[in-house]
Amino acid sequence: QAHPQLLLGSMGPIGIEWFAEDSAEYREIRGIAREQAHALLNAGVDGLLIETVTSIRNLQPMLAGARDAADGMPVLVSFVVDDKGDLLGDGLNIEAAVLYAEKHGANSVGVNCCSLAAANAAVPRMVASATTPVTVRPNVGDPVQTQDGPVWHENPEAFARACIEWRHAGAAMVGSCCGTSAITTAAMAEALDRCLACAVYAHP
């Protein structure tokens, strides 16, 4: 049986300073996020994904604008964390970030574009503090800079094993971010299918 395929509309980071909610700058950014969300939803996506969020100041107007346009569609939020599992940009602990996102309407919280070590640190903390599904999508490794740009050294088997560990830790959705090729994606899919088959067999 084929897996259901869902398409999320990605809304990336904006790299702003903090603005008060009643400022013209905040309202402008919120309006831009609203327009982007409208465009993605009109194109037929199944939900909105605000990803690679490094700080709450970046999330605030983006999440508000996305919620303005969502009209019942899910809005997922995904943070970038350091190897301790806290936000890379402002150092806020991941539990507080989860609380803020959920309080302001996020239907799922997670991490992406981080190291495996960062994901390993963040996932159990997020699962323990979140009331919504937790997602995890780290990079496949550390890039090596060459004259032709960054080169990523994949270890599909190790990444697939990590996916199983995140699922066992309580993550609802697992995947990958930068450096991913079809090889790693296939290894993930195979490992997760085996994990699901074993779970179904053990708990009919």
Feature names for model-found ranges:
Residues 1-204:
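Domain-level signal for soluble alpha/beta catalytic cores
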